[in-house]
């Protein structure tokens, strides 16, 4: 009986039905199928598809779906989350921090070019998108860190994931590129 109640209670989108309030200094425009959000840190645009209706009523943005089809339910929550991320991005910005754990692992940047020494025979050089600001932190006695900041949450996440993919943390010693605060699943080595 309990399972039936829980199953029937999922008819409404938990994320999509929550309205998004615009903070002071952020403007929101809807034209055709494109929404544009402008703030003190920059401007972001997103194309809206599949008949999802977006309304801006006195600084409160609501997202509505035309039907209860599976696709419309999925897009309902998606577009609400994207709009919320855009508003936070142009107002406060998004950041990710990576930590390089390993002997001889180093990171340096010159503008948008990131140079990584991750224990390979050659350094890895990455040309990062101009929308992402890179900061490398190297303190004596501590692991080097890379801080990425941008107004676009998706872009920051994609760049951070690409950097991490060059040397993912291994489970035995924990060496590699990891997110700051990431908890790694560790394994015990061979017992003699």
Regions found by a protein language model. Give the residues of each.
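Short, Lys/Arg-enriched N-terminal segments with co-localized hydrophobic residues
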Residues: 1-11
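N-terminal intrinsically disordered, cationic/polar leader segments
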Residues: 11-88, 92-161, 165-192
């Amino acid at each position: 009986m309990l399972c039936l109640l829980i199953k029937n209670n999922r008819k409404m989108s938990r994320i999509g039905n929550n309205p998004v309030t615009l903070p002071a200094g952020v403007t929101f425009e809807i034209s055709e199928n494109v929404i544009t959000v402008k703030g003190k840190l920059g401007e972001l645009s997103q194309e809206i598809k599949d008949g999802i209706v977006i309304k801006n009523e006195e600084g409160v943005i609501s997202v509505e779906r035309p039907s209860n089809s599976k696709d419309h339910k999925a897009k309902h929550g998606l577009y609400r989350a994207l709009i919320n991320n855009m508003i936070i991005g142009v107002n406060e910005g998004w950041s990710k921090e990576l930590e390089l754990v390993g002997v001889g692992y180093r990171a340096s940047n010159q503008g948008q070019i990131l140079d990584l020494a991750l224990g390979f025979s050659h350094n890895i050089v990455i040309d990062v998108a101009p929308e992402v600001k890179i900061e490398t932190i190297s303190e004596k006695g501590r692991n080097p860190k890379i801080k990425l900041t941008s107004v676009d949450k998706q872009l920051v996440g994609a760049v951070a994931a690409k950097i991490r993919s060059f040397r993912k943390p291994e489970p035995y010693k924990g060496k590699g590129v990891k997110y700051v605060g990431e908890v790694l699943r560790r394994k015990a080595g061979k017992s003699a």
